[in-house]
Swiss-Prot record:
Site, as annotated: Important for substrate specificity: I335
Organism whose genome encodes this protein: Sus scrofa (Pig)
Name of this protein: Amine oxidase [flavin-containing] A
Superkingdom of source: Eukaryota
Primary location class: mitochondrion
Localization per Swiss-Prot or TrEMBL: Mitochondrion outer membrane
Parts of the chain that traverse the membrane: 498-518
GO cellular component, one term: mitochondrial outer membrane
Residue intervals annotated with topology Cytoplasmic: 1-497
């Protein structure tokens, strides 16, 4: 009776309702609209963009306080943004990057800081090589089907790091690598999931690099424009301040209800929100047990994104580009990038407070965070000019109730093999998008576009408008942002690990001892 009453009161009938007005949901809606499908996007916030958010004010002009970076091999977001009339610019790494470790700053160039200790170098080299080799054994579209899935999914990344690395230097940087890439701790995440995550982003070098990597570029005017321009195209088919609370697909049409009791009827639904947020929605019939269990087991990463503005880019006077990799437990920030505008105006440094540090520093006042960051930059860059910013912007994604955190949801140990296969499995006429469901650059804007367009094509296939083989389409490489192959040198490919070196030394010692024993024996027998 209740369903019939809701159906009678539903004032809007559409073909598809998309839950979530981030890049993924809007990409889905845009594609459906191009096929003549009557689509409606319901967004909980008073803005579109989801985990991308461009703030505009007189102090910053514009600033991305959420997802911002694009680069080679991220061909879908590059194609979509170009279609929407957006341009990219390169993040500055013309000068030296800085590694800060044990209270000292070391300038360097390249993706990773150099290591001068030969044993630590072997350890580092083996870490990246082993992670990439393990990733090659994981299918991007079905990591749970990896030959080692069960074994690796029972391990945390801390377990794996402890297993691979011998030196404290390598272990410390490997932990930072996890913090930076997935905004969570090594002991929290499944080794299988993290290895898959790095693999589907192109490997350890591609995911971590600025040049030829995931952080090479930003959008002129901000990444929020992607969603804003799609909303402009869709017009009144995007509704803000409409959190969805109820989805009933027990009848011929699906009934969708929002928090303010607006009712909509449709044939299909796309859920384009983080998996854990679907727990805020009441479903009828109830979700299948595996899906219900999955959404309770995928926490979000923790991050506070901080932008410090200065009168001038003083770091360039020291031949620094603004990128800092900071290995210090007491430091609030773990990594920074230059966030100066492409025309050189509004000099700024963007820094991430990550994982355990985000949790700790979220408890203090904004001004305390600002002071701690300024003190840190002054130490790392060796300049008191860092202590005198002209403006500070930040965004604590941990307090966003309609995101739950950033960048992405992560899989704790055991979850990928037990429940992972249902991540994008439709439930009746409900299909799932969101960057977490992507198979390339999941966690990035690229993954959001892939997932949204794939979910849209699943519905188009159900409607008989595209064939099943066209649900998953290969994206041509961007002509504007070409990707260059990442290769390893002969030594990077062939140097032994520390364990391998010890075995070589042990074998050599044994052979030498045996030779000496034989030599002495011969001398004795001759005499």
């Amino acid at each position: 009776m209740e369903r019939q009453e809701k159906a009678n009161n539903a004032g809007h009938m559409v073909d598809v309702v998309v839950i979530g007005g981030g890049i993924s949901g809007l990409s889905a809606a845009k594609l459906l609209n191009e096929y003549g499908i009557n689509v409606l996007v319901l967004e909980a916030r008073d803005r579109v963009g989801g985990r991308t958010y461009t703030v505009r004010n007189e102090n910053v002009d514009y600033v991305d306080v959420g997802g911002a970076y694009v680069g080679p091999t991220q061909n879908r977001i590059l194609r979509l943004s170009k279609e929407l009339g957006l341009e990219t610019y390169k993040v500055n790494v013309n000068e030296c990057l800085v590694q800060y470790v044990k209270g000292k700053s070391y300038p360097f160039r390249g993706a990773f800081p150099p290591v001068w200790n030969p044993i630590a170098y072997l350890d580092y080299n083996n870490l990246w090589r082993t992670m990439d080799d393990m990733g090659k054994k994981i299918p991007a579209d079905a990591p749970w089907e990896s030959p080692h899935a069960e074994e690796w999914d029972k391990m945390t990344m801390k377990d794996l790091i402890d297993k691979i690395c011998w030196t404290k230097t390598a272990k410390r940087f490997a932990s930072l690598f996890v913090n930076i890439n997935v905004t969570s701790e090594p002991h929290e995440v499944s080794a299988l999931w993290f290895l898959w995550y790095v693999k589907q982003c192109g490997g350890t070098t591609r995911i971590f690099s600025v040049t030829n990597g995931g952080q090479e570029r930003k959008f002129v005017g901000g990444s929020g424009q992607v969603s804003e321009r799609i909303m402009h195209l869709l017009g009144d088919r995007v509704k803000l301040r409409c959190p969805v609370t109820y989805v009933d697909q027990s009848g011929d049409n699906i009934i969708v209800e929002t928090l303010n009791h607006e009712l909509y009827e449709c044939q299909y639904v796309i859920s384009a929100i983080p998996p854990t947020l679907t727990a805020k929605i009441h479903f009828r019939p109830e979700l299948p047990s595996e899906r219900n269990q999955l959404i309770q087991r995928l926490p979000m990463g923790a991050i506070i994104k901080c932008m410090m503005y200065y009168k001038e880019a003083f770091w360039k006077k020291k031949n620094y580009c603004g990128c800092m990799i900071i290995e210090d437990e007491e430091a609030p920030i773990s990594i920074t990038l230059d966030d100066t505008k492409p025309d050189g105006s509004l000099p700024a440094i963007m820094g991430f407070i990550l994982a355990r540090k985000a949790d700790r520093l979220a408890k203090v006042h904004k001004e305390v965070r600002k002071r701690k960051i300024c003190e840190l930059y002054a130490k790392v860059l060796g300049s008191q000019e860092a202590s005198h910013p002209v403006h500070y912007e930040e965004k604590n994604w941990c307090e966003e109730q309609y995101s739950g955190g950033c960048y992405t949801a992560y899989f704790p140990p055991g979850i990928m093999t037990q429940y992972g296969r249902v991540i994008r499995q439709p439930v009746g006429r409900i299909f799932f998008a969101g960057t977490e469901t992507a198979t390339q650059w999941s966690g990035y804007m690229e993954g959001a576009v892939e997932a949204g367009e794939r979910a849209a094509r699943e519905i188009l296939n159900a409607l008989g408008k595209v064939s099943k083989k066209d649900i998953w389409l290969r994206e041509p490489e961007s002509e504007d942002v070409p990707a260059f192959e990442i290769t390893r040198t002969f030594w990077e490919r062939n140097l032994p690990s520390v364990t391998g070196l010890l075995k070589i030394i042990g074998f050599s010692t044994s052979v030498t001892a045996l030779w000496l024993a034989v030599y002495k024996f011969r001398l004795l027998t001759r005499s």
